[in-house]
Swiss-Prot record:
Entry annotated with the keyword Transcription regulation: no
InterPro entries in the record: CAT-like_dom_sf, Plant_Fungal_Acyltransferase
Pathway as given in its UniProt record: Phenylpropanoid metabolism
Expression tissues: Highly expressed in root and rhizome. Expressed in senescent leaf and callus tissues. Expressed in detached leaf treated for 18 hours with ethephon, methyl jasmonate, salicylic acid or illuminated for 24 hours with UV light. Not expressed in mature leaf. Expressed at low levels in leaves and flowers.
Protein name in the entry: Hydroxycinnamoyl-CoA:piscidic acid hydroxycinnamoyltransferase
Entry function: Catalyzes the formation of cimicifugic acids. Uses hydroxycinnamoyl-CoA thioesters as hydroxycinnamoyl donor substrates. Has a strict specificity for piscidic acid as an acceptor substrate as none of the various other acceptors tested including 4-hydroxyphenyllactic acid, malate, spermidine or tetrahydroxyhexanedioic acid are substrates. Donor substrates include 4-coumaroyl-CoA, caffeoyl-CoA, sinapoyl-CoA and feruloyl-CoA. No activity with cinnamoyl-CoA, isoferuloyl-CoA, 3,4-dimethoxycinnamoyl-CoA or 3,4-dihydroxybenzoyl-CoA as donors.
Noted pH dependence of activity: Optimum pH is 7.0.
Enzyme's top EC category: transferase
An example Gene Ontology molecular-function term: hydroxycinnamoyltransferase activity
UniProt gene name: HCT1
Keyword Magnesium listed: no
Catalyzed chemical reaction(s): (2R,3S)-piscidate + (E)-4-coumaroyl-CoA = cimicifugate K + CoA; (2R,3S)-piscidate + (E)-caffeoyl-CoA = cimicifugate D + CoA; (2R,3S)-piscidate + (E)-sinapoyl-CoA = cimicifugate J + CoA; (2R,3S)-piscidate + (E)-feruloyl-CoA = cimicifugate E + CoA
Catalytic residues (UniProt): 153, 395
Pfam families attached to this UniProt entry: Transferase
Length: 448
């Protein structure tokens, strides 16, 4: 049980610009719901909750000076679009206690209990009333500490969010030398509403539905659950080796990556567990960081959303029975990733900015069971990799986190790839339908 003890608003400790920040289509198409994550710490010495809370409030107020947009609010401007008013309304910080021990949460898979470790956001309120950043400090019975963070996805992607979180942690440790973030969203291509798309943007046309169904309504209503799966470095390396053994004889490109091998393996296991017919179209939606794919590249400390999605589509039968096996699936994924270049990004942006209403194109809402946005569940998957994010740098003074992950996964088919310990292992939190999850886990390990 988690008991909320107090809550307060934290504002920047110094005056900050009172401006309305333009949000490009790369921001606009993201969900305005909050991505909930939490960090778990086991301090070596006993920490007073009140002292930790006061320190966090102070350091947060200082961190909100360079990251002043997070103290603002969204305002609707029509057409399913928003602007970001940097009005210093502030972030919210919450103090909580739990009568549980860290070991009671097992592998920390996203459940109704872990959801309570991140701040609750009341989506019954108008978007303009919602803080963009909420934080929850939870002290556990065993002395462990949890920091739950909920940040509106429409203002930042994972890399931008971690820029803020690591800055805040650094300030809380008493360190100096903060690197200033880059907030000017006009650096991302603004788009030309008169230009016609030059590429085939599968993800903007809609996603496959089950054969015999006219829509995803029936699948969206089915019960889902989560699992937390683990791959050792040896298992990941084995998948990579397996994928590269399946390359065509005339293939001359670079080796398939760990990410491509894991993604292909997961896609095959899902199609198998879902018992798709051979002719069933299935898609794998992948989130791509575009910072270095745009021309010119974005500044390294760009704080907004610089990701776009790209989608692979294939028949389930071919994924499972092609003679090249995992190598074939990786070739499909490779083509999907490699096409995301400067022209592809700008073509997608031109399409989005030409739409009168962006609402039909917004997806990935974080609240479990949401009926909003594009459905990415059966027969589809949506994958995001957090490998490469500086998770172990989030040290508030209690040492490195012993765990970091999501408190919730919003929908069927959603999964993450999270780095494990500093040994090349990974953790895969995934949400699937109850009818499919056991078989998926079985194939996930058996088919390596």
């Amino acid at each position: 049980m988690v008991c909320i003890k107090s809550s307060c608003v934290v504002k920047p400790s110094e005056p900050t610009p009172n401006v309305k920040l333009f949000l490009p289509e790369s921001d606009q198409v993201k969900p305005w719901t909050h991505a909930p994550v939490f960090f778990v710490y086991q301090p070596e010495v006993d920490n007073s909750v009140s002292t930790s809370l006061e320190n966090l409030k102070f350091s947060l107020s200082r961190a909100l000076v360079p990251y002043y947009p997070l103290a603002g609010r969204l305002n609707g401007i029509g057409g399913g679009r928003f602007e970001l008013h940097c009005n210093t309304m502030g972030a919210v910080i919450i103090e909580a206690e739990s009568d549980a021990r860290l070991e009671d949460f097992g592998d920390f898979r996203p459940t109704s209990e872990t959801t309570k470790l991140a701040p609750y956001v009341d989506y019954a309120k108008d978007v303009s009333e919602l803080p963009l950043l909420l934080v929850q400090l939870t002290r556990f019975k065993c002395g462990g500490i949890g920091i739950g963070i909920a940040m509106s996805h429409i203002v930042s992607d994972g890399k931008g969010a971690f820029g803020f979180i690591t800055t805040w942690a650094k300030i809380n440790r008493g360190e100096k030398g903060i690197i200033e973030p880059f907030h000017d969203r006009t650096a991302f291509y603004k788009g030309d509403p008169t230009a016609k798309p030059r590429c085939d943007h599968v993800e903007l046309k809609g996603y496959p539905v089950l054969l015999g169904n006219k829509s995803a309504k029936e699948e969206r209503a089915k019960e889902t659950t989560t699992r937390m799966l683990n791959l050792s470095k040896n298992q990941v390396d084995k998948l990579k080796e397996k994928s590269n053994l399946g390359k065509p004889k005339d293939y001359v490109g670079r080796e398939y990556s760990r990410f491509e091998a894991m993604s292909g393996h997961i896609w095959r296991c899902a199609s198998k567990a879902r018992r798709h017919e051979n002719e069933q179209l299935t898609s794998l939606r992948i989130t791509i960081d575009c910072r270095n794919r745009l021309r010119p590249p974005l500044p390294p400390r760009y704080s907004g959303n610089a990701t776009m999605v790209t989608t692979s589509i294939a028949e389930s039968g071919e994924l499972l029975s092609n003679p090249l096996g995992l190598g074939f699936v990786c070739s499909v994924i490779r083509k999907c990733i490699d096409k995301v270049d400067d022209d592809y990004i700008k073509s997608a942006t031109d399409f989005l900015i030409s739409q009168d209403d962006l609402t039909p194109y917004r997806s990935g809402f974080h609240n479990v069971g949401s009926t909003e946005g594009v459905f990415l569940g059966n027969p589809n998957l949506a994958i995001t990799s957090w490998v490469g994010l500086p998770i172990n740098d989030v040290d508030f003074g209690w040492g490195k986190p012993i765990y970091m992950g999501p408190t919730a996964l919003g929908y069927d088919g959603k999964l993450l790839i999270i780095p494990g310990k500093d040994d090349g292992s990974v953790i895969v939190p995934i949400r699937l339908q109850v009818a499919h999850i056991d078989d998926f886990e079985k194939f996930f390990y058996e088919d390596i």
